[in-house]
Amino acid sequence: MSITSIRALLRSAVSLARTKPLRFTNLKDIKLRPPIPPTVENFQVSPDHPLWQFFPEGNQTTNAIREQDDLDHDSREWTSAELRQKSFEDLHRLWYIILKERNILAREVRLAESIGMRDVKQFNNIDYKLIKSLRRIKQVLLERHIAFERSQASPSVQEEKNEYLEEFSERYLNAEGKEIEEMDEKLDRLQYAFFGIEPTMDIETLQDDIDVNFIKGMEYSSNLKAQKYNKLNPESELELPLRGPMEELPFLLFDVEDAVQQVKELRESGQSRELYKIETIPFLSKAIKSHLEGQE
């Protein structure tokens, strides 16, 4: 299509549009609704709306900004000595309670400034106490982290840990009769205490759970289970030690007999191999996630 024909088409479209003016008929029959004044009653807000968390009394809050007398002026910040006595769960919970209160204060201060209220000093004073508490929580957590790293780096602590693992391995392999089930339960607890391997894994926390310590724990417990299986089943031809995470993982996810069968199938198919370090965590994350999704 040429430029001339396009221009002609545009002109005809404009001219046709002009020949059809907008007209209203029967104007007397048109009924107009009265205007709706903008009031709070015209809006319905869910009582469970997340933004209610920014108000001190939630959906029961009656004032957008608290009066000075309604503020808690007598409270004080948490001391480091008090925080050191709290568990990790308590510190985590306390951190978010304080953070929520800071968000409430920040909303009130921002609103007060937007409508010209200048006296927000009391709000800021309370916020300063909350900030000091948050800083002390971080300090206490840092102290614990440093203490943990020093304890892990201590040769004596590591030697004691290795001695205990060797002693446990001997008791586990020599267990007989009813002791076997009891030692299996102890192994599950040991995995969690020494290596952080949860008895029940969760997809939501999987990325945080799998680390170098997790891999070490899986190696220890899987080879221990395989050795026990060979001892109870002398006819078994399972060659030990296991060849890395690919063969160790089945012992973490399945019963020992099923795990042994899977390892044999891997070896017979030629798929079993030792993983590079850079492959290990992605492989474990993908395999465990797939297993957990299959159970849902």
Swiss-Prot record:
UniProt entry tagged with the keyword Mitochondrion: yes
Cellular compartments per GO CC: mitochondrial large ribosomal subunit
Boundaries of the annotated transit peptide in chain numbering: 1-19
Keywords: Mitochondrion, Ribonucleoprotein, Ribosomal protein, Transit peptide
InterPro entries to which the protein is assigned, alphabetical: MRP-L47_sf, Ribosomal_uL29_mit
Assembly with partners or alone: Component of the mitochondrial large ribosomal subunit. Mature mitochondrial ribosomes consist of a small (37S) and a large (54S) subunit. The 37S subunit contains at least 33 different proteins and 1 molecule of RNA (15S). The 54S subunit contains at least 45 different proteins and 1 molecule of RNA (21S).
Family under the similarity heading: Belongs to the universal ribosomal protein uL29 family.
Protein name: Large ribosomal subunit protein uL29m
Species name: Lodderomyces elongisporus (strain ATCC 11503 / CBS 2605 / JCM 1781 / NBRC 1676 / NRRL YB-4239)
